[in-house]
């Protein structure tokens, strides 16, 4: 039995044990295995605090914002509560339990693994379910973030801890909730109404930056309000409402007319105050029968939206570690490449207030799954009641956010039952959990958030096959979990592709963290030294940090279809990330050429630990090659080139735009050896918002496919296509490159030969690139944006590694 050790709150026990040297860092090497004994342990946290009953406030509450997960709370040696839900706060009235002076607080956590197994055994006996029933293990019976039990991109670290803040609240009366509703008139006027849940015997006075109301109820009539839009469609205008809770004997009629003076008067007498930010907007989910099936299309403020974004997983294996700063960095990275929507995946969390506030500010719509994923769940009795309570708490917390666009019952549970995942013989006799998604959650939303769209599962389409593509949304995994070659993305018939992805290696910086580069000796059992890190891609540690369940040789073979065989870990990082980029480019261009697809949400934006995965940005914050390509793929104006046996076609498409796209476009064949133009066509064009057009057809006869690049240009828009596989190309040798850094965060680079997929890396970790992984079809000077100190750079393209010559003067 361990003695008492120092602990951090908020925190998780694994983090404390690492800090105290009891276990090794589970993110390094293969240490995950050696840490899993902690999952089966009971853990206690204790502290003591001074309390002086000097306050005039008659009520005192102890509030835990997050407890992970099954625990009992003791105050001064007496159990005062039990809790079993990571997603719901716990608030306890301790007005009569606190003592003057020193108070002792203890929280005792049971093992979520052992509790889940025990409940499962009882439930299976009651239901008469065989032990071999698939997708119904211990995680289904504990309301805890499901990814912590391990996923195909994350470790199994079923931790415990006080994962969100704890506070002692003293009050006379409180505003518990403010719900702001919007009524939109046909002429564009909007009425805001604030409905407050507050203690009896008080009055609520609400101020907004658009108007004033004395008393609870109507806030403001706005004849021409500034609306909130997702990124790319308009501004993210937010209005702040401030609610004041005042005694019943307060004379509201005496409030000054001047707003500042009135608020100062209220602040002096208020028993409580709460601020709420709202954005004026409408969001609808259109699902209409048509000749293709049934649509799945978001409409914001009456305008059709092509949703462009990604799936979001928790940003750390131990969610107590996720900071507002880290959230901002990831979310700004999403906006930087033109995303307008994120899907908060059902195996994770209801995210923190910080997350939704940042999405409001950045214009990122949120598709919010309720936290159920890839499993069956009990759906009646105590479990159903707990889910209802959890949902009520979180719907109230999140419903005022303009970024919140959709509630979804679960991730893939419906299609899991339809397709008998785990085998027909191991499928349960009914869809366990269905009552939650069809009854419990819709009823909560009807009561608390009736205006926001809801779907019971994702994907959700046809009655027999919810993942058919022609109806509803689709998770298109036929490539990664099926045919392997990314060219098959062109077979998807999705109306809305809410999950699809292609995995790749994390960055060398992430690998350095895995191999614990700070140590001095070679790693036991690893074929690398810490100072060189030229690891074999088949090294056991490298393989351990691949949870894709694909079989590592298959993973390698997917890249080998197109790229040379990697000889070093650095080769694998480079080639696998290019292959991921190619895959997502193929898919996104296909979806945006489609006449009926209205959304693309890539799996996945982020990682929770250093791993090879589908992420666009790894755990070290390093964008992969695909991330840089997304700026082009998510732009309103998109060019794409498709190849047939005898010709290439140039396609144009326009989405999320307020005006037509007009101009002159060219499609050229360029020599990869010299950069000279071999053949070219051009045309005038005009494309309306939502329109797709084929504008040019270039003959390919007589071209050397191994040494030709197709280049399309129109203003700032461009597209490239190779006629041969990258591993078959004839390229100019890797010549030195001249680079210069200016004070505005711009790197100028001069190339003397064409370069395909030039990637700059920073061995010192001092540079963050905003532009990278570029193709330069002709010799010249290119400007790339960066942040940080421009030193210690390395460069490689498909031709090989390029020496860099740093110049003190600008190149242009």
Residue ranges and their predicted role:
Residues 60, 73-75, 188-216, 648-686, ...:
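Beta-strand-rich binding/interaction modules
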Residues 219-226, 670-705, 766-790:
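Intrinsically disordered, low-complexity Pro/Gly/Ser/Thr-rich segments with frequent PxxP/GP/PP motifs
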Residues 23-51, 58-63, 68-75, 81-84, ...:
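Active-site-adjacent substrate/metal-binding segments within catalytic domains
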Residues 248-261, 272, 699-735, 789-812:
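Terminal connector regions
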Residues 1-63, 136-165, 169-172, 253-260, ...:
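Extended carbohydrate-recognition surfaces in non-catalytic/accessory domains of CAZymes
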Residues 343-361, 366-541, 579, 597, ...:
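Substrate-binding/catalytic cleft of secreted carbohydrate-active enzymes
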Residues 12, 35, 40-172, 199, ...:
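Accessory beta-strand-rich segments of carbohydrate-active enzymes
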Residues 8, 147, 158-161, 173, ...:
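Substrate-binding clefts and catalytic carboxylate motifs of secreted carbohydrate-active enzymes
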């Amino acid at each position: 039995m361990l003695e008492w050790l120092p602990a951090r709150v908020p925190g998780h026990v694994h983090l404390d044990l690492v800090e105290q040297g009891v276990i090794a860092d589970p993110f390094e090497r293969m240490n995950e295995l050696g840490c899993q004994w902690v999952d089966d342990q009971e853990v206690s946290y204790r502290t003591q605090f001074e309390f002086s009953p000097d306050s005039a406030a008659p009520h005192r509450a102890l509030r835990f914002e997050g407890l992970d997960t099954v625990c009992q709370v003791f105050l001064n040696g007496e159990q005062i509560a039990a809790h079993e839900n990571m997603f719901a706060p716990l608030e306890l009235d301790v007005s009569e339990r606190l003592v003057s002076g020193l108070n002792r607080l203890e929280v005792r956590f049971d093992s979520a693994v052992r509790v889940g197994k025990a409940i499962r055994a009882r439930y299976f006996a009651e239901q008469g379910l065989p032990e071999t029933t698939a997708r119904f293990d211990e995680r289904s019976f504990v309301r805890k973030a499901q990814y912590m039990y391990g996923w195909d991109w994350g470790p199994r670290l079923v931790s415990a801890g006080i994962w969100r803040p704890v506070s002692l609240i003293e009050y006379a009366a409180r505003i518990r909730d403010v719900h702001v509703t919007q009524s939109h008139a046909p002429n564009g006027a909007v009425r805001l109404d604030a409905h407050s849940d507050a203690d009896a015997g008080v009055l609520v006075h609400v101020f907004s930056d658009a108007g004033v109301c004395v008393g609870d109820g109507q806030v403001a009539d706005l004849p021409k309000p500034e609306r909130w839009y997702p990124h790319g469609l308009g501004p993210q205008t937010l209005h702040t409402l401030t609610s004041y809770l005042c005694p019943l004997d307060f004379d509201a009629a005496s409030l000054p007319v001047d707003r500042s003076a009135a608020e100062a008067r209220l602040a002096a007498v208020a028993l409580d105050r709460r601020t709420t930010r709202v954005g004026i907007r409408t969001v609808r989910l259109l699902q209409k029968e048509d000749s293709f099936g049934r649509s799945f299309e978001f409409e914001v403020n009456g305008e059709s939206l092509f949703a462009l974004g990604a799936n979001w997983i928790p940003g750390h294996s131990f969610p107590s570690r996720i900071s507002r700063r880290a959230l901002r960095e990831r979310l700004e990275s999403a906006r930087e490449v033109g995303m307008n929507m994120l899907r908060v995946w059902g195996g994770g969390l209801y995210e923190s207030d910080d997350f939704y506030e940042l999405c409001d500010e950045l214009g990122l719509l949120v598709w919010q799954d309720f936290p159920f994923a890839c499993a069956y769940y009990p759906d009646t009795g105590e479990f159903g009641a707990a889910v209802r309570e959890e949902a009520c708490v979180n719907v109230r917390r999140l419903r005022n956010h303009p970024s919140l666009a959709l509630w979804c019952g679960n991730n893939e549970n419906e299609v899991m039952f339809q397709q008998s995942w785990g085998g027909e013989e191991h499928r349960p006799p009914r869809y366990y959990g269905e009552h939650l998604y069809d009854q419990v959650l819709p009823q909560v939303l009807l009561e608390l958030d009736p205006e926001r769209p809801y779907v019971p599962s994702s994907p959700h389409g046809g009655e027999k096959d919810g993942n058919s593509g022609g109806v509803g949304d689709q998770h298109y995994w036929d490539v990664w979990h099926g045919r392997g070659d990314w060219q098959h993305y062109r077979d998807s018939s999705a109306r809305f592709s809410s999950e699809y992805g292609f995995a790749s290696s994390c960055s060398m910086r992430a690998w350095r963290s895995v191999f614990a580069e700070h140590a001095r000796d070679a790693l036991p059992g690893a074929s690398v030294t810490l100072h060189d890190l030229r690891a074999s891609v088949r090294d056991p540690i490298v393989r351990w940090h691949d949870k894709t369940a694909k079989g590592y040789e298959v993973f390698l073979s997917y890249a080998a279809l197109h790229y040379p065989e990697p000889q070093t870990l650095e080769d694998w990082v480079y080639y696998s990330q290019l292959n991921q980029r190619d895959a997502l480019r193929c898919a996104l261009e296909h979806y945006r050429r489609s006449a009926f697809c209205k959304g693309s949400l890539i799996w996945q934006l982020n990682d929770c630990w250093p791993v090879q995965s589908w992420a666009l940005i790894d755990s070290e914050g390093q964008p992969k090659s695909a991330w840089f390509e997304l700026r082009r793929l998510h732009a309103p104006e998109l060019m794409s080139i498709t190849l047939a046996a005898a010709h290439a076609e140039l396609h144009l498409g326009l989405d999320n735009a307020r005006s037509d796209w007009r101009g002159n476009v060219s499609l050229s064949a360029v020599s990869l050896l010299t950069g000279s133009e071999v053949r070219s066509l051009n045309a005038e064009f005009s494309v309306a918002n939502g329109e797709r057009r084929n504008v040019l057809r270039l003959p390919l006869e007589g071209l050397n496919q191994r040494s030709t690049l197709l280049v399309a240009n129109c203003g700032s828009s461009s597209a490239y296509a190779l006629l041969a596989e990258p591993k078959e190309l004839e390229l100019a040798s890797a010549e030195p490159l001249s680079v210069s850094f200016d004070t505005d965060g711009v790197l100028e680079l001069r190339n003397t030969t064409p370069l395909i997929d030039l990637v700059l890396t920073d061995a010192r970790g001092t540079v963050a690139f905003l532009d990278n992984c570029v193709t330069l079809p002709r010799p010249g000077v290119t400007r790339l944006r960066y942040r940080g100190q421009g030193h210690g750079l390395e460069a490689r393209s498909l031709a090989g590694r390029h020496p860099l010559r740093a110049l003190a003067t600008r190149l242009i």
